[in-house]
C-alpha cells in the first residue's frame, strides 16, 4: 500500500484469484468488504465490493499517516482466468477493460495504474 500512496496510484488491476485448485496463488492484500485494516502507516477501508460477470470491482478509502492524505482507490480483479490455461472467451476481460478505462477517465486520465 505504500507503493500505491507513493506513486499516487488510483487503479489496481489484478488478473489472478487468491486460490486456484486449492493452491495459494496470491496473498490477499486488502480487507474484507466494509472492514478496515492497517498496513504499516497506511489505513485501508474496503468501502464497496461489486461483482460483475467475470470480475470484481472494489472501492477502497486509503489514508496515509505519513503523507497526511486520503484518497479513493479502485481494484478490478478478473476472476475467470483458469490456472495454467486461457479463458474460453475474452468477452468478460474486454468488459472489465472498458470499466477500467472509464474509471481512469473519471478520476483523471493521467493517474497511474498498477497491473
UniProtKB/Swiss-Prot annotation:
Pfam families: Y_phosphatase. One of its GO terms (molecular function) is protein tyrosine phosphatase activity. Its EC number is 3.1.3.48. It catalyses: O-phospho-L-tyrosyl-[protein] + H2O = L-tyrosyl-[protein] + phosphate. PROSITE patterns: TYR_PHOSPHATASE_PTP. Keywords: Hydrolase, Protein phosphatase. InterPro entries: Prot-tyrosine_phosphatase-like (IPR029021), Protein-Tyr_Phosphatase (IPR050348), PTP_cat (IPR000242). Substrate binds at residue 83. Residues 1-115 form the Tyrosine-protein phosphatase domain. It is an enzyme of class 3 (hydrolase). Belongs to the protein-tyrosine phosphatase family. This is Tyrosine-protein phosphatase 23. It comes from Styela plicata.
Amino acid at each position: 500500500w505504500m507503493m500505491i500512496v507513493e506513486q499516487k496510484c488510483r487503479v489496481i488491476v489484478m488478473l489472478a484469484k487468491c486460490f486456484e485448485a486449492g493452491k495459494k496463488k496470491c496473498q490477499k492484500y486488502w480487507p474484507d468488504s466494509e472492514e478496515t485494516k492497517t498496513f504499516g502507516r497506511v489505513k485501508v477501508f474496503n468501502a464497496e465490493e461489486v461483482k460483475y460477470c467475470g470480475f470484481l470491482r472494489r472501492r477502497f478509502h486509503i489514508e496515509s499517516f505519513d503523507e497526511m492524505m486520503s484518497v479513493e482507490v479502485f481494484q478490478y480483479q478478473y476472476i475467470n482466468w483458469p490456472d495454467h490455461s486461457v479463458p474460453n472467451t475474452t468477452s468478460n476481460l474486454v468488459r472489465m477493460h472498458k470499466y477500467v478505462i472509464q474509471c481512469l477517465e473519471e478520476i483523471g486520465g493521467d493517474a497511474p495504474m498498477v497491473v
